[in-house]
């Protein structure tokens, strides 16, 4: 009889411990930082549309952007030095796209034949990489090799 009571006690105790452990909720949850934001083509276009740098107006450029065609933008007034636009616009572009979850990787600056005494367009080229998984990321991987943004000053490039 004592053996049966002892066995019953062990079964009840084990069941109680199991029930308590299954209901144990963590008191300090941690976020999963490996989860990435899903980036869409609209995010990319909004980032281009929202770009701001000195007197270049990007309004209307993002919404009409087609991959494979350069985005051409003219300054509304004044100009910038070639060195200034290389650093300043390059950083603005990288920041605007990063805010939408798009990695530009290396941005190359091509001044072509531009000099401080002319208005020749300069180009910024990069290959975007979307963070996360989406149809846009697949499109980037399969068809988009490079995005080009051409800037033309209103007046000659400054020194």
From Swiss-Prot:
**Keyword set for this entry?**
Cell outer membrane, Lipoprotein, Membrane, Palmitate, Repeat, Signal
Question: At which residues is a lipid of type S-diacylglycerol cysteine covalently attached?
Answer: 22
Q: What are the subcellular locations of this protein?
A: Cell outer membrane
Q: Which positions are lipidated as N-palmitoyl cysteine?
A: 22
Which residue pairs form cystines in this protein? none
Location (main, coarse) = membrane
Quote a single Gene Ontology cellular component term.
cell outer membrane
Recorded topology in the membrane? Lipid-anchor
Q: Where is the signal peptide?
A: 1-21
Please identify the protein, giving its name as recorded: 16 kDa outer membrane lipoprotein
User: What organism does the record attribute this protein to?
Assistant: Brachyspira hyodysenteriae (Treponema hyodysenteriae)
């Amino acid at each position: 009889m004592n053996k049966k009571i002892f066995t019953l006690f062990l079964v009840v105790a084990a069941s109680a411990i199991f029930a308590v452990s299954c209901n144990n909720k963590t008191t300090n949850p941690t976020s999963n930082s490996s989860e990435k934001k899903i980036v869409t083509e609209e995010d990319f276009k909004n980032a281009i549309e929202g770009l701001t740098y000195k007197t270049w107006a990007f309004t209307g450029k993002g919404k009409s952007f087609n991959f494979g065609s350069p985005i051409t933008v003219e300054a509304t007034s004044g100009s910038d030095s070639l060195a200034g636009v290389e650093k300043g616009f390059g950083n603005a572009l990288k920041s605007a796209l990063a805010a939408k979850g798009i990695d530009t990787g290396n941005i190359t600056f091509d001044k072509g034949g531009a000099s401080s005494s002319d208005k020749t367009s300069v180009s910024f080229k990069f290959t975007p990489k979307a963070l996360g998984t989406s149809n846009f990321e697949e499109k980037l991987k399969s068809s988009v090799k490079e995005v080009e943004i051409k800037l033309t000053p209103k007046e000659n490039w400054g020194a």
